[in-house]
Amino acid sequence: MSANDYYGGTAGEKSQYSRPSNPPPSSAHQNKTQERGYPPQQQQQYYQQQQQHPGYYNQQGYNQQGYNQQGYNQQGYNQQGYNQQGYNQQGHQQPVYVQQQPPQRGNEGCLAACLAALCICCTMDMLF
């Protein structure tokens, strides 16, 4: 797929911006969207606590940037953008056990024979 096909035009054409016909959303629309998140009263309490005690975490466990102490923001997603389900949180990691094989004996003879054969081959190659 070419860029012209993707963007729907030729390289020399410029699309004209048209101004939207509707005005921006009113404050009634903003009140509806605030119902989905934290209510404004809790946000006001949060900012009042931050002004009284700057630099400390408030009682709800959120720091100044709006992230809680565990690294997850208010919507339930961590800072990398993954949700909490299916990922281990810090402090709940499963231990990993590593087993080392005991050293095996009896291969030294074979290793010495291969090294001797390699030395003989290199010596013969240099002589002839």
From Swiss-Prot:
Q: Where is this region: Disordered?
A: 1-106
Record-listed N-acetylserine modification sites: 2
Q: What other note does the entry give for this protein?
A: Present with 1760 molecules/cell in log phase SD medium.
> Which family does this protein fall into?
Belongs to the CYSTM1 family.
Report what the Swiss-Prot or TrEMBL entry states about this protein's PTMs.
Palmitoylated near the C-terminus.
Q: Which UniProt keywords apply?
A: Acetylation, Cell membrane, Isopeptide bond, Lipoprotein, Membrane, Ubl conjugation
Residue spans with biased composition (Low complexity)?
37-106
This protein is called Lipid-anchored plasma membrane protein CPP1
